[in-house]
Regions:
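Charged, glycine-rich active-site and insertion segments that engage polyanionic ligands
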Residues: 2-106, 117-184
């Protein structure tokens, strides 16, 4: 166990850019026989990453957990509910680092989708795939000002990076929650 960090620090990591949403959408339809509507949602949510899209397809319940956590965080942030923030941090703090990073990626993608929805007046958002989750995209899009977008993206991107740096997930999540409260 003492040698593993040394080995990892000597490894070279190559970031491979995602294929792109349209290519992943076509691949899901052709190779996995996924319905076009589902393929479109999955390609958007995976940001063009076929592995993540396939993971979401095969593990819908994992995606539902992220959607519920996102909705909860937005409600807590808007209400400036510190008690709720504490409970949310405790719940998400028990997740693994990889799952927490995926949550931050998921959240930034959702904010982007909602911004597109706001600018176009319609469109698909991940919550369309989960009718059992109570989230009013139209109502939230009215609260979301375009000036908030860089701040939201910064919170989610920095959270993902901080988790990758092995910072304490509870501290990162609490910081993200406080910063989101400041945005509203």
């Amino acid at each position: 166990s003492g040698v593993l960090p040394t080995i990892i620090s000597r490894c070279l990591v190559f970031s491979i850019p995602p294929l792109g949403g349209k290519q992943v959408e076509r691949w899901l339809i052709k190779e996995r026989n996924v319905a076009p509507d589902t393929a479109r949602v999955l390609s958007k949510m995976s940001c063009g990453d076929p592995g993540l899209a396939l993971d979401y397809l095969e593990n819908r319940e994992n995606l539902k957990v992220f959607a519920e956590a996102f909705v909860s965080s937005m409600k807590i942030s808007f209400k400036k509910d510190f008690q709720g923030l504490h409970l949310w941090v405790e719940e998400l703090g028990s997740w693994g680092r990889g799952q927490t990073q995926e949550y931050f990626t998921f959240s930034s993608t959702v904010i982007s989708e909602i911004a597109k929805y706001k600018s176009m007046g319609s469109g698909e958002v991940i919550f369309d795939w989960f009718p059992e989750i109570s989230f009013k995209t139209e109502g939230f899009s009215k609260l979301l000002k375009y000036s908030y977008l860089p701040m939201f993206m910064s919170v989610f991107d920095e959270g993902k990076i901080d988790i990758g740096r092995n910072l304490n997930p509870k501290i990162v999540l609490f910081d993200a929650g406080i910063r989101m409260m400041e945005i509203f």
